C-alpha cells in the first residue's frame, strides 16, 4: 500500500504546536508515511480576514510542523473542504452572503452558483501550498453535501453544480502537478458512475466507519479506478473525554479483510474525528488516538490482528515500557471510568516511556469520572423528581442527595484544578478551558437546580413530620 495515513482533525481540540512535533515522531515510528491535516479554523487564513480560533497555530508554526514531517518522511496532505463543513467561515456576518440558500441559509455549505466561493477556496488553497512547499497530494474534501437546501441562485440541479465545482477544484490543484483526493460518499449516494465526470487521476477515498458496503467496494475494485479507503480510529461517545476503543478495532479489522481481498487499494487513512463542524462541541483526537493508530498500522502492515490482548501487551511494553491491562482499557474506557482509574493511575506513575500519553489518558479519564458521578446523581434525582416535589422523601434520603449536590460542585472544581497544570503541558490553555466549559458549565448550573429542588423537598418533609 503506497499511502498509510493518519487524520489530524484540527477543527477540534488541538495540542500545542511544540507537542504536535512529537506526535509526528511517533506516527513515523509506527510506520505511517502520511498525515492528513484538516485545518479549518486553526489555520490563520489571510483570505478569511483573520477570522480564526484563538488557539490557531501561526503560519510559522505550521511551516515548522511541515518541515518536521518532511524530516520524518511523513507526507503532509492538506485537506481543504471545497463544498461543505464550512461553518468556520460562513458563521461570520462577513461571509453570510456566500451561504447556500442566501444570507439566511445554512452556514454548513456555501452556494456553488457563486463564483466568489470558488475564488475564496482557491485563495485559501494557495495559502496552504505556500506554507507547505513540496506538497504532493491535496485533499479537497467534498463530503456530506446537502442537495436539498433550497437556493434561488442554485436552482434545482445541485448535483450538477456539485460535480462541476469538484471538477474545477480538482483541475486547479492538478495544474500544480499534485495528486487530488476527495471523499467518495456523494458519488456513492448518487451514482458511482459519475466518478467518470471527474478529471482523470482524481482519487476517491472510500470512508465507512461502521458497516462496510461490500457490494460497493467490489464495484469500486472492478472499476479500474485508483482509490483509497478510510477507517475510523477515534470518535467520542456523548462527549465523553476518553473514546471507546473496541468499536474502532472492529472497523479497522473489517478494512484489514478488505485490503487483503483488494490489494490494489493504494492508500488508507485512519480518521480521528473531534467534531462534525467547528460549531459543535470539541473532542480530543491526536494525541489520544495513539493506541488505535498503532493498531491500524499493524493491520495495514501484517493483516487483521487475531489476538488483541497479545497486541495490546506488546504495544504497552514497546510504547510505555509496561504491559497494558487489556480488559481494563477496553471494557472501562469511556464506559466505566472509575474502574479504569486504577489502570491509568498505574500507567501514569510507572510508564518508563511516553509518560505524556499516560498523563493525557489519566487526565481525561479523571474528567469522565467526574461526569460519571454527576450523571449518577442527576439520574437519581430525575427519577425521584415527583417524590422530591411532593416532599415525601425521608430526611436521610434527601440529605444524602443534597450531599451529592455538594460533591458534584466541590469535587468537580477541585478535580479540574488538580489536573489542569498537567494537561496544559500538552494543550493550549484556552483550548483546555473550552473543553472543560462545554462539559461542565451546563451541568453545574443544573446542579444548582437540584440543590433548589432538594432543599425544598427537605423543607416539605420537615413540615409533613410536624403534622
Whereabouts are the PLM-identified features?
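Substrate-binding groove of N-acetylhexosamine-processing glycoside hydrolases
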Residues: 1-4, 16-25, 64-67, 73, ...
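Conserved, charge-rich beta-strand/loop surface module that forms ligand/interface-binding patches
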Residues: 1-13, 32
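Aromatic- and acidic-residue-enriched carbohydrate-binding clefts of CAZyme catalytic domains
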Residues: 2, 26-29, 34-75, 84-119, ...
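Generic enzyme active-site microenvironment
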Residues: 7, 79, 141
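Generic anion/oxyanion-binding catalytic loop in active/binding sites
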Residues: 9, 110, 331
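Short, flexible active-site loop motifs that bind/organize anionic cofactors or intermediates
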Residues: 10, 52, 242-245
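An acidic- and aromatic-residue-enriched active-site/binding cleft used to recognize and process polar
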Residues: 11, 40-42, 81-83, 143-145, ...
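Generic alpha-helical scaffold signal
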Residues: 14, 21, 56-59
Amino acid at each position: 500500500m503506497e499511502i498509510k495515513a493518519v487524520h489530524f482533525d484540527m477543527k477540534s481540540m488541538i495540542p500545542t504546536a511544540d507537542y504536535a512535533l512529537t506526535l509526528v515522531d511517533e506516527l513515523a515510528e509506527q510506520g505511517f508515511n502520511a498525515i492528513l491535516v484538516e485545518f479549518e479554523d486553526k489555520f490563520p487564513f489571510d483570505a478569511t480576514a483573520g477570522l480564526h480560533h484563538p488557539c490557531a497555530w501561526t503560519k510559522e508554526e505550521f511551516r515548522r510542523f511541515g518541515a518536521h514531517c518532511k524530516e520524518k518522511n511523513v507526507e503532509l496532505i492538506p485537506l481543504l473542504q471545497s463544498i461543505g463543513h464550512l461553518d468556520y467561515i460562513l458563521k461570520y456576518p462577513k461571509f453570510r452572503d456566500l451561504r447556500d440558500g442566501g444570507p439566511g441559509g445554512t452556514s454548513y455549505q456555501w452556494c456553488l452558483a457563486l463564483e466568489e466561493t470558488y475564488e475564496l477556496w482557491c485563495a485559501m488553497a494557495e495559502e496552504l501550498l505556500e506554507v507547505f512547499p513540496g506538497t504532493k497530494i491535496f485533499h479537497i474534501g467534498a463530503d456530506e453535501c446537502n442537495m436539498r437546501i433550497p437556493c434561488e441562485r442554485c436552482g434545482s440541479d445541485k448535483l450538477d453544480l456539485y460535480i462541476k465545482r469538484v471538477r474545477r477544484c480538482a483541475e486547479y490543484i492538478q495544474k500544480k502537478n499534485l495528486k487530488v483526493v476527495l471523499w467518495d460518499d456523494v458519488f456513492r449516494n448518487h451514482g458511482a458512475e459519475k466518478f467518470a465526470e471527474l478529471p482523470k487521476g482524481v482519487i476517491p477515498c472510500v470512508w465507512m466507519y461502521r458497516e462496510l458496503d461490500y457490494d460497493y467496494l467490489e464495484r469500486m475494485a472492478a472499476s479500474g479506478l485508483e482509490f483509497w479507503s478510510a477507517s475510523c480510529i477515534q470518535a467520542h461517545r456523548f462527549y465523553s473525554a476518553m473514546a471507546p476503543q473496541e468499536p474502532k478495532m472492529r472497523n479497522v479489522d473489517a478494512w484489514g479483510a478488505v485490503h487483503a481481498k483488494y490489494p490494489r487499494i493504494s492508500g488508507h487513512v485512519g480518521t480521528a474525528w473531534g467534531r462534525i463542524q467547528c460549531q459543535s462541541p470539541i473532542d480530543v483526537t491526536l494525541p489520544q488516538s495513539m493506541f488505535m493508530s498503532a493498531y491500524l498500522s499493524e493491520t495495514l502492515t501484517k493483516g487483521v490482528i487475531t489476538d488483541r490482548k497479545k497486541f495490546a501487551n506488546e504495544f504497552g511494553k514497546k510504547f510505555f515500557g509496561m504491559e497494558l491491562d487489556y480488559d481494563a482499557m477496553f471494557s472501562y474506557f469511556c464506559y466505566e471510568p472509575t474502574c479504569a482509574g486504577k489502570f491509568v493511575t498505574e500507567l501514569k506513575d510507572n510508564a518508563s516511556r511516553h509518560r505524556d500519553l499516560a498523563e493525557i489518558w489519566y487526565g481525561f479519564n479523571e474528567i469522565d469520572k467526574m461526569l460519571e458521578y454527576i450523571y449518577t446523581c442527576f439520574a437519581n434525582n430525575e427519577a425521584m423528581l415527583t417524590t422530591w416535589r411532593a416532599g415525601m422523601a425521608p430526611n436521610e434520603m434527601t440529605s444524602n442527595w443534597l450531599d451529592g449536590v455538594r460533591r458534584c460542585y466541590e469535587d468537580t472544581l477541585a478535580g479540574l484544578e488538580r489536573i489542569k497544570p498537567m494537561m496544559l503541558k500538552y494543550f493550549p490553555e484556552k483550548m483546555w478551558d473550552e473543553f472543560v466549559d462545554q462539559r461542565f458549565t451546563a451541568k453545574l448550573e443544573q446542579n444548582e437546580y437540584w440543590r433548589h429542588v432538594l432543599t425544598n423537598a427537605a423543607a416539605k418533609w420537615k413540615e409533613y413530620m410536624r403534622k
